[in-house]
Amino acid sequence: MRTILLFCLALGSASVSAQETGMHRVQRIFEAGRDGYYTYRIASLVSTARGSLLAFCAARKGTGGDWDPIDIVMRRSTDGGRQWEPMRVLVPGGAKPSDNATPIVDQVTGQVHLLYQTDYARCFYRQSSDDGMTWSEPVDITSVIEGFRSVYPWVVLAPGPGHGIQLRSGRLVVPFWLSDGGQREFGPNHRGHRPSIVVSVYSDDHGRSWRAGAVAVPDNDTTVVPNETSCIELADGRVLFNTRNESPNYRRLLTYSPDGATGWSTPVFADAFFEPICFGSMVRVSQIPDQSKNRILFCNPDSRQDPWKAAKPATPRSAPNRHRVNLTVRMSYDEGRTWPVSKVIDPGVAGYSDLAVTPDGMIHCFYEGGTIEGTGGNHFKNTHMSVVSFDLAWLTDGADRPSRGDKPFRTPAVR
């Protein structure tokens, strides 16, 4: 049986700014306090094989914490983000958290695959064959993650968040983070999310079955609590994991695999990417030969100039969060070796984000913004989640545009 979602069109709160060069549009599509939820967090965004945008997030009750009651909700746009259908509850969490929606677009079958967790203890899989209008019943795939118990005694699991990827081989790849719960930072009644490691999970049959890969980023005195990870396939076929961590270096961790499953390289810190201890997102915009240039984007809060820090001092195993402000998108033309383009898309409070590209070449960033009044500027308690849409001309102040012969970008899978 399939769950049928019925939609009506609804226009979100929108603003289109007149720019000297390029196109730039912002829409608030989730607002704190609406529909019985305290706040909305944890952005996931994909552009489907047909070009629809699907925006998933965590609708949080209580005080918006990780262990409060959480539903997974979704909104859908079929016109490049100009109009958004009403919010639908995709996964009701009940009294427990359901979170970390991680969609993957399958360019071969046209399906959208979705992984998510419930109570940080079980992982489920669903798929849609009609651009998110209907979804299959949940399938429990926790047994796949059990395969990592031989190398790590986890008690907490979570995919993504953000989106997973499809490789040119057709393989689907999703990063997971696992924790042994030892720190108990949420108190005695909840399993902790620290320490943690990052692992890979994959499917070679379009989501019909899933397999455990290998540990991509272990936890040690260098990597320091690696967890939420974004990923991308490079032009040479390697898969890059870009990982949040709590090292006092305040830099992202990068590790590479030849196939997205095993053979992960020793993680290294990326000087180009400031790490405020927050999820950051990646997406490919174009790739030779279908387009004239290779282009990759990365987005996170670049708050390196912000003086705010938590009261506790940094230690080798405990770096305090930096303020989540100054959401910045960067672009690389050489598969991540250098990042010459940088532009702030929100100078205010902004946290988790996810990126997607529609066939018209527009780039879309779905992100958390603002702080609820009376919370002392707490960046974990967002007032809204917005989608900002822009083109290459806006991002580069007119220095870069698609070439005349460029094809709409699609993962060039061969199966």
Question: What are the residue ranges of the model-derived segments?
Answer:
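Positively charged n-region of N-terminal signal peptides that target proteins for export
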Residues: 1-4
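Intrinsically disordered, low-complexity repeat segments enriched in small/polar residues
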Residues: 6-7, 414
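Hydrophobic h-region of N-terminal signal peptides that target proteins for export
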Residues: 8-17
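Asp-box/BNR beta-propeller blade signature and adjacent active/binding-site loops
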Residues: 19-415
